[in-house]
A protein has these predicted regions:
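N-terminal small-residue-enriched
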Residues: 1-154
Length: 154
């Protein structure tokens, strides 16, 4: 459930929204820009093993290495880290260099199940206002379909 947008005073005024303290920057050398700080998906009630067993063919992504998001269109691409092929409900072989491609709003509409497992992590967000620390977390999420590109299955 989208609860609010990240807006600063200038863009909030343009959009008719109140500023919500979302502007961040690496240091005084950068102009502040409305950016994420802590982003997460709350845990659900689904069992991860049953979620995997329900997939005929897909991938299981355990980690994301890097990516980018167009803040205007919501289009994203993420390069996966540890990733495996799922065939007939079983995790089979590692997948090398997979790229997840889509639009945030579209993918959120395709979420079918949300696991009860949950992990928090940390990282960096790189943008025009510098590199800043971020917190993120989520459980295992099953998405009905997504564009996946890549080199090969190991």
């Amino acid at each position: 459930i989208l609860k609010n947008y990240l807006v600063d005073r200038l863009n909030g005024k343009k959009l008719g929204l109140s500023a919500n303290g979302s502007s961040r920057r690496e240091s005084y050398r950068f102009a502040p820009v409305a950016r994420m700080s802590n982003t997460y998906i709350a845990p659900g009630s689904d069992d991860v093993e049953k979620m995997i067993a329900s997939v005929d063919r897909g991938i299981y992504v355990k980690s994301i290495n890097a990516g980018s998001v167009n803040s205007i269109t919501g289009e994203f691409n993420f390069n996966t880290g540890e990733t495996f092929l799922i065939e007939h409900g079983e995790i089979t072989v590692p997948v090398h260099s997979a790229t997840l491609i889509g639009t945030g709003g579209d993918i959120l509409q395709k979420v079918e199940q949300v696991g009860k497992d949950y992990e928090l992590g940390q990282g960096f967000c790189y943008a025009g206002s510098g590199a800043i620390y971020i917190g993120a977390g989520q459980p295992t999420v099953k998405v009905s379909e997504m564009t996946v590109g890549g080199d090969e299955i190991c």
